[in-house]
Amino acid sequence: MEKVTNDTIKHVAALAQLEFSEEELAKFTPQMGKILEMAEELQAVDTTGVEETVQVVDRDTVFREDVPEKWQTREEMMKNVPDKSNGFVKVPVIIDKDDNQ
């Protein structure tokens, strides 16, 4: 396994659009290294003959029927929106488009 470095954490943080201080990087880098070491140990476990688990919760544990309810009017909702334009909710850009793509 590759050693986890500050650059590794910075790269993953950038992908998740997170920013960390140098103190946080110094703290998170060894923690992430330990987590990945544990995951590597799990990969070594022999699971031959073990049935795959796709859901750990019983599917019959529904507490109520999923019935849509009228929550509030559009106007009431728009009163709570911090940034709007022409009656639409404005949200920050999360995907940068490159002209070369």
From Swiss-Prot:
Q: Which reaction does it catalyse?
A: L-glutamyl-tRNA(Gln) + L-glutamine + ATP + H2O = L-glutaminyl-tRNA(Gln) + L-glutamate + ADP + phosphate + H(+); L-aspartyl-tRNA(Asn) + L-glutamine + ATP + H2O = L-asparaginyl-tRNA(Asn) + L-glutamate + ADP + phosphate + 2 H(+)
Q: Which PANTHER family match?
A: GLUTAMYL-TRNA(GLN) AMIDOTRANSFERASE SUBUNIT C, MITOCHONDRIAL
Keywords attached to this Swiss-Prot or TrEMBL record, sorted alphabetically, are:
ATP-binding, Ligase, Nucleotide-binding, Protein biosynthesis
Protein source organism: Lactobacillus delbrueckii subsp. bulgaricus (strain ATCC 11842 / DSM 20081 / BCRC 10696 / JCM 1002 / NBRC 13953 / NCIMB 11778 / NCTC 12712 / WDCM 00102 / Lb 14)
Describe the subunit structure: Heterotrimer of A, B and C subunits.
Which EC class is this protein assigned?
ligase
Q: What is this protein called?
A: Aspartyl/glutamyl-tRNA(Asn/Gln) amidotransferase subunit C
- In the UniProt record, what gene is named as encoding this protein? gatC
> So what EC number does this one have?
6.3.5.-
One of this protein's Pfam families, by short name?
Answer: GatC
Described function: Allows the formation of correctly charged Asn-tRNA(Asn) or Gln-tRNA(Gln) through the transamidation of misacylated Asp-tRNA(Asn) or Glu-tRNA(Gln) in organisms which lack either or both of asparaginyl-tRNA or glutaminyl-tRNA synthetases. The reaction takes place in the presence of glutamine and ATP through an activated phospho-Asp-tRNA(Asn) or phospho-Glu-tRNA(Gln).
The Gene Ontology biological process terms listed for this entry are: glutaminyl-tRNAGln biosynthesis via transamidation; regulation of translational fidelity; translation
Q: Decide whether keyword ATP-binding is in the record.
A: yes
**Family as reported in the entry's similarity comment:** Belongs to the GatC family.
Q: Which GO terms describe its molecular function?
A: asparaginyl-tRNA synthase (glutamine-hydrolyzing) activity; ATP binding; glutaminyl-tRNA synthase (glutamine-hydrolyzing) activity
